[in-house]
Amino acid sequence: MSDGDYDYLIKFLALGDSGVGKTSVLYQYTDGKFNSKFITTVGIDFREKRVVYRANGPDGTVGRGQRIHLQLWDTAGQERFRSLTTAFFRDAMGFLLLFDLTNEQSFLNVRNWISQLQMHAYCENPDIVLCGNKSDLEDQRAVKEEEARELAEKYGIPYFETSAANGTNISQAIEMLLDLIMKRMERCVDKSWIPEGVVRSNGHTSTDQLSEEKEKGLCGC
Amino acid sequence: MADTIFSSGNDQWVCPNDRQLALRAKLQTGWSVHTYQTEKQRRTQCLSPGEVEVILQVIQRAERLDILEQQRIGRLVERLETMQKNVMGNGVSQCLLCGEMLGFLGSSSVFCKDCRKKVCTKCGIEASPGQKRPLWLCKICSEQREVWKRSGAWFYKGLPKYILPLKTPGRADDPHFRPLPVEPTEPQPQSAEVSRVYTWARGRVVSSDSDSDSDLSSSSLEDRPMPSGIKGTKYDKPRGDSGGSMESPRMGPARPPSHLSGSQSSLGSETGAGATDPQGGTLPRPEPRVSGKRHTWATTHY
């Protein structure tokens, strides 16, 4: 694991209230295990995982696998670590925003966390995946799925109901975030290479302008 | 321990950025002064020495990963520089990369979208094979885009800090010094030999490391199954020509814009003065100038 033999280093950061299961979700994803004992995270931590990403091309063909080294930052949700953890927001390429399905206050604080992201992340619209954790505790559920999905649609972010205890939807959530990041990377690289003012006066002028407008609108960086 | 992390590796004092200041404030290091806080507030907000120790250990682990990443990016940059150094044609009547004659009596050519030079179909890569209008890139510009993606430069708005491979320290200097003066006749055979040996050695590295993946991707796009052998043969022919033809392609081909501004990739591990990233700002697009590019490129290495 500690070698430089990969194609991309991608950094994600998990955030949310204290006790919602950020550390457990990342531990389940990297090691496939769950520890029911609650040990509060001190400030900041990170885990690593090597995955293979296969992009789906526009024509439906599956591209060649690319080796991704994931650095998964785990933050402390407590208020007294806030200024420490927000300092790490800028280096993260994507964010995993967690709340506890059995704790309505953690769901209400999702708005505050998104505001924190808009202030401290690398841009105002970073890629976020919302996760309602502890979906296995159905009898203690306090947040309806419709409510959470409605909030996610309002912010335009994907929503998954996860469980660190049994591993439900954890891989899907992180793979969705990785897909969003890789697509954003392709848009950024393609956009930055379009030379401005070099549109030649030929039969394809209108096509070039249309494609440029589309690409400009898509890229949020 | 904290002072060691924040002040190590750099004798010259550099003003710390906002994130370092925020981190120092919370860790009670640096020049942070809590003038207006009462003792009670200070005690509740301060981290205990044990907590500070845990956080610093995490930061050290992150720095070890960053070093590996910097070395990996250095290998990508070295590979790209080698490709740029080994161009053999003028990109107009000859293929930019292999120097093969193009046009009426020569091979068919394609036009690179980025550097706007001509290359033969073997030295070009179709960037969007599924669409109606084929979009071609020469292999150098395609490799440039790969470096931009794999190094994280798309995210940091510039090429992050990297460490060049140590096994070839002399060659790292070559691209910056040799193009500037006019080389005398005698050293040319030596440089040609060195280039040949290095190209052959690079072929070995390609077959064993992650570079082979991109080569496999390239070969799948090409029609002929044995491109490397044919290219090797063609590489030898132009070297036998006069020195003038070797000089002109180095001046002629313009490199695609590569932004080499430093960027903070790890909090607390770098003390270099990086430019503040504008939130939501557009990507920088400087005017392409050959001398400016090389100067910027050279600055980053030292």
From Swiss-Prot, chain A:
One Gene Ontology CC term in the entry: secretory granule
The enzyme's E.C. designation: 3.6.5.2
This protein's record includes keyword Cell cycle: no
Pfam families attached to this UniProt entry: Ras (PF00071)
Chief localization: membrane
Matching Gene3D superfamilies: P-loop containing nucleotide triphosphate hydrolases (3.40.50.300)
Single GO molecular function: protein domain specific binding
InterPro entries: P-loop_NTPase, Rab27a/b, Small_GTP-bd, Small_GTPase, Small_GTPase_Rab
Binding, GTP: 16-24, 74-78, 133-136, 163-165
UniProt-listed PROSITE patterns: RAB
Catalytic reactions of this protein: GTP + H2O = GDP + phosphate + H(+)
Modified residues (Cysteine methyl ester): C221
Positions of post-translational Phosphoserine modification: S2
Domain of life of the native organism: Eukaryota
Sorted UniProt keywords: Acetylation, Disulfide bond, Endosome, Exocytosis, GTP-binding, Hydrolase, Lipoprotein, Lysosome, Membrane, Methylation, Nucleotide-binding, Phosphoprotein, Prenylation
Modification sites for N-acetylserine: S2
CDD domains cross-referenced by the UniProt entry: Rab27A (cd04127)
Location of this chain's protein in the cell: Membrane; Melanosome; Late endosome; Lysosome
Main EC class the enzyme belongs to: hydrolase
GO biological processes: antigen processing and presentation; blood coagulation; complement-dependent cytotoxicity; cytotoxic T cell degranulation; exocytosis; exosomal secretion; melanocyte differentiation; melanosome localization
Lipidation (S-geranylgeranyl cysteine): C219, C221
Function according to Swiss-Prot or TrEMBL: Small GTPase which cycles between active GTP-bound and inactive GDP-bound states. In its active state, binds to a variety of effector proteins to regulate homeostasis of late endocytic pathway, including endosomal positioning, maturation and secretion. Plays a role in cytotoxic granule exocytosis in lymphocytes. Required for both granule maturation and granule docking and priming at the immunologic synapse.
Subunit structure comment from the entry: Binds SYTL1, SLAC2B, MYRIP, SYTL3, SYTL4 and SYTL5. Interacts with RPH3A and RPH3A. Binds MLPH and SYTL2. Interacts with UNC13D. Does not interact with the BLOC-3 complex (heterodimer of HPS1 and HPS4). Interacts (GDP-bound form preferentially) with DENND10.
Family: Belongs to the small GTPase superfamily. Rab family.
Protein known as: Ras-related protein Rab-27A
Swiss-Prot record, chain B:
Binding site for Zn(2+) 2: C112, C115, C138, C141
Residues carrying Phosphoserine: S248
UniProt cross-references to CDD domains, sorted A to Z: FYVE_RPH3L (cd15763)
Protein name according to UniProt: Rab effector Noc2
Tissue expr: Highly expressed in pancreatic islets and parotid. High to moderate expression in adrenal gland, pituitary gland and ovary.
Membrane in keyword set: yes
Zinc finger (FYVE-type): 89-146
Pfam families in alphabetical order: FYVE_2
Taxonomic lineage: Eukaryota, Metazoa, Chordata, Craniata, Vertebrata
Segments for region (Disordered): 174-194, 206-302
SUPFAM superfamilies referenced in this protein's UniProt entry, alphabetically: FYVE/PHD zinc finger
Cellular component aspect of the GO annotation: presynapse; secretory granule; synapse; transport vesicle membrane
A molecular function GO annotation: small GTPase binding
